[in-house]
């Protein structure tokens, strides 16, 4: 009975749906010393459940053949299966999962004793980390199980994944809200206690604290509630305080017991806060420059006469020399030319403040006309519908 206290409610529905959409489904169940068998065709049982032997094992084997009457394509994508089974192995430490693709004689074995710690390690592979992985499990008074693993790295992106009873929530929910609240509170408390905020003269936000963070949040909830049938957001209100309380206790202790890691994390947060402030100033400067330019357009841009974006084209060319040739050969009515330096900046590896302070990037932003930042960016304002 304990096996189903924190189920996701998907297993019963799924086997019913698979059965209905299969030309054949075969069940073999080993239980209580006996092996039981039943077979279905297009959802209809071919005979009652029957005993076919004895065993000292327990478990269920399900084999199914997708119906070609229903599906036009019945090819299984092994990469999708591998990704999900690997994920399940991380979420259930010590569970061994074997995936065999007999079409190409391929076998994957997933067995992660470290659970979520190994999940974070897998995601952060190849990245420079700032602290050893922080990992804890807790059973709360409300009957909710909480497990969290996290680590900061030198990247600038936040990567937090949430799960409820092994089901992923790409839109987060109450477990993510509790985690973020506890994380921000714990880090702010540490920064204040160490007098870092006054010393560095910066204001820190939750976004600053989560820059470069990789985290996995897994909760086990007896009766979870989701925002939709696809279970992409957890809305159980009792989960937030459970996660927040457990995370607050464990993470605060971690920062106190690991001063070197705490110092590295604090340094990362201060850098992120400064970069955010620098980006804000650069953004304002870009806006002011745009307002002062004639018609708000960069000087190097040779604009076209056409005002309808759907009929306008922008050609990005490398260097003034190529720009001159392009301007001579263009159709002035519909083709605009913007000369830029080659290899201006790898924006995937650069912080936002560095990106926005680049003259070439600023010129490009102004020419396109969409604006920058979460609050201002509007693709409907794009001045050219064809960019080459």
UniProtKB/Swiss-Prot annotation:
Ranges for domain Toprim: 312-388
The family database entries (Pfam families) matched by this protein are listed as: DNA_gyraseB, Toprim
* Location, primary (coarse class): cytoplasm
- What EC identifiers does the entry list? 5.6.2.2
Q: Which UniProt keywords apply?
A: ATP-binding, Cytoplasm, DNA-binding, Isomerase, Nucleotide-binding, Topoisomerase
Q: Which reaction does it catalyse?
A: ATP-dependent breakage, passage and rejoining of double-stranded DNA
Q: Which SUPFAM superfamilies match?
A: ATPase domain of HSP90 chaperone/DNA topoisomerase II/histidine kinase, Ribosomal protein S5 domain 2-like, Type II DNA topoisomerase
GO MF terms here are: ATP binding; DNA binding; DNA topoisomerase type II (double strand cut, ATP-hydrolyzing) activity
Q: Which domain of life is it from?
A: Bacteria
Q: Where is this site: Interaction with DNA?
A: 343, 346
Cellular compartments per GO CC: cytoplasm
Write down the PROSITE patterns for this protein, in alphabetical order: TOPOISOMERASE_II, TOPRIM
Q: Does the keyword Isomerase apply?
A: yes
Which GO biological process categories is it annotated with?
Answer: DNA topological change
What is the annotated quaternary arrangement, including any partners?
Answer: Heterotetramer, composed of two GyrA and two GyrB chains. In the heterotetramer, GyrA contains the active site tyrosine that forms a transient covalent intermediate with DNA, while GyrB binds cofactors and catalyzes ATP hydrolysis.
Question: Miscellaneous notes for this chain?
Answer: Few gyrases are as efficient as E.coli at forming negative supercoils. Not all organisms have 2 type II topoisomerases; in organisms with a single type II topoisomerase this enzyme also has to decatenate newly replicated chromosomes.
Q: What does this protein do?
A: A type II topoisomerase that negatively supercoils closed circular double-stranded (ds) DNA in an ATP-dependent manner to modulate DNA topology and maintain chromosomes in an underwound state. Negative supercoiling favors strand separation, and DNA replication, transcription, recombination and repair, all of which involve strand separation. Also able to catalyze the interconversion of other topological isomers of dsDNA rings, including catenanes and knotted rings. Type II topoisomerases break and join 2 DNA strands simultaneously in an ATP-dependent manner.
This protein's name: DNA gyrase subunit B
Protein species of origin: Acinetobacter calcoaceticus
Top-down, what is the taxonomic lineage of the species of origin?
Answer: Bacteria, Pseudomonadati, Pseudomonadota, Gammaproteobacteria, Moraxellales
């Amino acid at each position: 009975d304990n096996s189903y206290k924190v189920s996701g409610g998907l297993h019963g529905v799924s086997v019913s749906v698979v059965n209905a959409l299969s030309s054949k489904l075969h069940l073999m169940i080993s239980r209580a010393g006996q092996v039981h068998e039943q077979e279905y065709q297009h959802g209809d049982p071919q005979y009652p459940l029957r005993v076919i032997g004895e065993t000292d094992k327990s478990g269920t084997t399900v084999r199914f053949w997708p119906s070609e009457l229903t599906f036009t394509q019945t090819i299984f994508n092994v990469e999708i299966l591998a990704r999900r089974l690997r994920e399940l192995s991380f979420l259930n430490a010590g569970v061994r999962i074997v995936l065999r693709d007999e079409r190409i004689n391929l076998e994957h074995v997933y067995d992660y004793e470290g659970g979520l710690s190994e999940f974070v390690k897998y995601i952060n592979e190849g990245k420079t980390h700032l602290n050893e992985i922080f990992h804890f499990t807790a059973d709360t008074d409300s009957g909710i199980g909480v497990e969290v693993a996290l680590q900061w790295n030198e990247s600038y992106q936040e990567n937090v994944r949430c799960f409820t009873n092994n089901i992923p929530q790409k839109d987060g929910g109450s477990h993510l809200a509790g985690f973020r609240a506890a994380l921000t509170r714990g880090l702010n408390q540490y920064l204040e206690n160490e007098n870092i905020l006054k010393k560095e003269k910066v204001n820190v936000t939750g976004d600053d604290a989560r820059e470069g963070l990789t985290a996995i949040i897994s909760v086990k909830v007896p009766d979870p509630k989701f925002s939709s049938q696809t279970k992409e957001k957890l809305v159980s209100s009792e989960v937030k305080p459970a996660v927040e309380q457990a995370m607050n206790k464990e993470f605060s202790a971690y920062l106190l017991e690991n001063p070197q890691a705490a110092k590295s994390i604090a340094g990362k947060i201060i850098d992120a806060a400064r970069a955010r402030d620098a980006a804000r100033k650069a953004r304002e400067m870009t806006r002011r420059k745009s307002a002062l330019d004639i018609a708000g357009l960069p000087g190097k841009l040779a604009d076209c006469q056409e005002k309808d974006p759907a009929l306008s084209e922008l050609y990005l060319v490398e260097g003034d020399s190529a720009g001159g040739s392009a301007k001579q050969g263009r159709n002035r009515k519909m083709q605009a030319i913007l000369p830029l330096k080659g290899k201006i900046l790898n924006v995937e590896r650069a912080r936002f403040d560095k990106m926005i302070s680049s003259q070439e990037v600023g010129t490009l932003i102004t020419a396109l006309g969409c604006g920058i930042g979460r609050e201002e960016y509007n693709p409907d304002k794009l001045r050219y519908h064809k960019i080459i």
